[in-house]
Design a protein with these regions (language model features):
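Class I S-adenosyl-L-methionine-dependent methyltransferase module
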Residues: 1-124, 128
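Signature of N6-adenine DNA methyltransferases within the class I
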Residues: 1-28, 120-229
C-alpha cells in the first residue's frame, strides 16, 4: 500500500526567472518600519540576485549581500520580507474566461512556488551535499558569470566545477558536521592556477577520499576526459 503521511520531496529549481519588478518588492516595506529605506535597498539587491537566477542557478545566495553588513538591523526581518516579495510572484487568478486554465498564469504560479522553495533551500545548511557539478572553463563563461565568480570565488574562478565545489562547501553544515561528495575534473589537483584553492581546502577542510576515475569513467561520450570522485 501507500505509506500514510509521507512528506513531499524537498525539490526546487534554482533557475527560474523573477517576474515582479524591484519596485514591487520594495513596496512591501511599510513606511513606518525601522530602517525602512535601508530594508528597501537590501530588497532591491536581493531582487537583482534573483534576476540572475537563469544564469547563476544554485550559485545564488539570497543572504550574500547581508553577510558582511553590520548595519543590517535583522537578517530574519529581511528574510521574511523576501518571502513576502516572492509570494507576489503569482497571478491574481489562475482562471480565465470559461474557467479555462491560462497557460501563462499557470507557468507564473509554478515559477512563484519554485522561487519560494529555492530561496528556502539555498538558505539552508546540510549534512550531505552530493552532485555532479557543471564543467565550464573561464574562457567560455558568460561575462556576468565571470564577474560573479571573480567577486565571490576568486581562487576557484578558472572553472565552474571548482566554483561549485566551493558553493557545495558553503551549503554543508559547519564544524565538520557536513560532508560534500562531487564528481569533477581532476586536473585542478596539480595545475598551478588552482594552488591557492588547494591550499585553503587543505587548511580548512578534511579530505576523506579522492578517487581518480580517469578517462571514460562513465559510459557516455561526454565523459571522455579525466574525472575524479
Amino acid at each position: 500500500g501507500v505509506r500514510a503521511g509521507m512528506p513531499a520531496p524537498q525539490v526546487a529549481c534554482c533557475g527560474l526567472k523573477v517576474a515582479a519588478k524591484p519596485e514591487d518588492w520594495m513596496a512591501l516595506v511599510p513606511d513606518d518600519a525601522a530602517n525602512a529605506a535601508y530594508l528597501r535597498q537590501e530588497l532591491r539587491l536581493l531582487h537583482a540576485s534573483f534576476a540572475q537566477a537563469p544564469l547563476l542557478g544554485s550559485l545564488l545566495d539570497p543572504a550574500r549581500s547581508l553577510k558582511n553588513d553590520l548595519a543590517t538591523s535583522s537578517f530574519d526581518t529581511l528574510r521574511d520580507l523576501l518571502g513576502r516579495a516572492l509570494a507576489t510572484e503569482r497571478p491574481a487568478t489562475l482562471w480565465g474566461q470559461a474557467s479555462e486554465l491560462q497557460d501563462d498564469s499557470w507557468d507564473l504560479a509554478l515559477t512563484a512556488k519554485g522561487l519560494l522553495d529555492a530561496a528556502r533551500l539555498l538558505d539552508g545548511r546540510y549534512h550531505l551535499v552530493v552532485t555532479n557539478v557543471p564543467y565550464l572553463a573561464r574562457g567560455k563563461q558568460h561575462d556576468t558569470l565571470k564577474d560573479y565568480c571573480e567577486a565571490h570565488y576568486p581562487e576557484a574562478k578558472n572553472d565552474l566545477a571548482n566554483v561549485f565545489l566551493e558553493r557545495c562547501l558553503e551549503l554543508s553544515c559547519d564544524q565538520g558536521a557536513g560532508v560534500v561528495q562531487i564528481v569533477m575534473p581532476q586536473n585542478w589537483l596539480f595545475l598551478a592556477s588552482y594552488s591557492a584553492q588547494r591550499k585553503q581546502l587543505l587548511v580548512n577542510s578534511t579530505w576523506c577520499m579522492t578517487a581518480l576515475l580517469g578517462a571514460k569513467g562513465f559510459q557516455t561520450p561526454m565523459w571522455d576526459f579525466n574525472v575524479q570522485l
